């Protein structure tokens, strides 16, 4: 899944910057935040060790890719693209944290709706 989405985004937006990895990591962070919110709000299966280890660490951790992000940042620096490398590092870290918070907060907000 990561390979196909990353490749698709790269072909659509361009490959002079690692947009594919960027999109994969931010979307994965959002889904991990959503899963954590489900565990905190609903409990049950969503708060079990197996859910945490298999879904969050295994599947979603395997979907996102810190190693590719790091290598691409170093390659940008080696290619003389220090600004793009810095943007990649700062924007990835910031947006991934915000995406986790948005996923988590979104679940908390939705689950408080009267219904």
From Swiss-Prot:
NCBIfam families: PRK14233.1. This is Fluoride-specific ion channel FluC 4. It catalyses: fluoride(in) = fluoride(out). The gene is fluC4. It comes from Brucella melitensis biotype 1 (strain ATCC 23456 / CCUG 17765 / NCTC 10094 / 16M). Fluoride-specific ion channel. Important for reducing fluoride concentration in the cell, thus reducing its toxicity. Belongs to the fluoride channel Fluc/FEX (TC 1.A.43) family. Keywords: Cell inner membrane, Cell membrane, Ion channel, Ion transport, Membrane, Metal-binding, Sodium, Transmembrane, Transmembrane helix, Transport. Na(+) is not transported, but it plays an essential structural role and its presence is essential for fluoride channel function. GO terms for molecular function: fluoride channel activity; metal ion binding. GO terms for cellular component: plasma membrane. It is a multi-pass membrane protein. Signal peptide: none annotated. The keyword RNA-binding does not apply.
